[in-house]
Amino acid sequence: MKIRIGLITAFCLAPLISSCASDDIEIKPMSRFELEHDGLIREYFVFLPTAYDTNNDYPAIIFMHGYGGTATGTEAEVTQGLNFYAEKFGYIMVYPQSTWFMAGDSPDRQWVATSWNHISDGFDKGPDGPICTEDAAQYACPPECGSCGKCGWASCNDDVGFLKSLLASVSADFAVDESRFFVTGFSNGAMMSHRIACDASELFAGVALVGGRVEPGFECMPTKALPLLQINGGKDNAVPHDGKASEGGYFFASTTSVTQHWTGSDACATDVKDWVSQTTEGENVQCTIACAGTDHPVIDCIWPDGNHRWPGTSGFRGSNGYCVSELQSASMPEQTICIAPDPTAEFWGSQLLFEFFDEYRGN
């Protein structure tokens, strides 16, 4: 049986963003903010839609970058203009920056290593066994970890605490509907989204994991039932969707395992159906849904031809988000300046993300 959902956007009554895009679209630039947490000054960037009015409350999305990426580079290079979709749907966007350090084996071979503490890394094994192969590629160990072991590569800073403080600050400073905080991210940012949604599910209305999942044994069932969207490329060798070892020799939970843990003992968990929306119908993407008809469905979409990049993008501009905007260049001067995204470009992954959050607003 196939479930067909007709999702309608908030600002455009057509299924695809191309129907309401224009060559002269203009949006507000992002603003930079700082927050002190656990003795560290952390930065984040906020986008407000043009229609923003302090007399109204707006839904907000926390979006986290991937390994090596930046907050502003992810918006410009990875998603290639997610703020254009936030403008059309009327969402506040919040892009936090992870901690980072200079990695490299010599002074002339240095690079910025950014990462999120998505499982308190620094060990070789997880609850279900090894999380990397014997010959896995070695990553630079974040200095705060002390020792990372063979399989460790992610930050050991208190990112869960930072994100909780971030939500509190955003709620205090902006007209946010606190019942409609959503969290998402790409790659390592998706992994961190999984963790914060599990550790603080009461703060969110929905979750989307794009191109990233936690290691085996770290899947969870959130205390508060939340809708979940997963989008992964069928040819993604960095974070394979089927749980096999990555090209670098690291293991990540399969999308099926994440779904099973997320839904837990719910009887609806075993009732998995094909799923299609107006956006996915015209794309080469295959989706299923578990717990359809509830307020916490789990939609799992596989993009057969996709690799480790934002769904719908060609990847010609890169998918890492290493660059920074002018706004972030002072804090990360080693990074190149991003090329401004094309406001008329269309990406089904971005459209589906906002449709999902608009349709499934949690409890």
Regions found by a protein language model. Give the residues of each.
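Bacterial N-terminal signal peptides that target proteins for export
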Residues: 1-7
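Bacterial N-terminal signal peptides
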Residues: 8-15
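A domain-start/cap signature at the N-terminus of enzymes
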Residues: 20-60, 73-92, 155, 181-208, ...
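Serine-hydrolase catalytic machinery in alpha/beta-hydrolase-like enzymes
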Residues: 37-45, 55-182, 195, 199, ...
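Acidic glycine-/aspartate-rich tracts in secreted/extracellular proteins
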Residues: 51-52, 67-69, 99-102, 106, ...
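Cell-envelope and extracellular/periplasmic
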Residues: 64-69, 168-174, 186-193, 197-198, ...
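The feature captures the conserved acid-bearing segment of alpha/beta-hydrolase catalytic domains
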Residues: 87, 205-295, 299-308
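Alpha/beta-hydrolase-fold serine-hydrolase catalytic core, especially in secreted/extracellular enzymes
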Residues: 141-151, 263-363
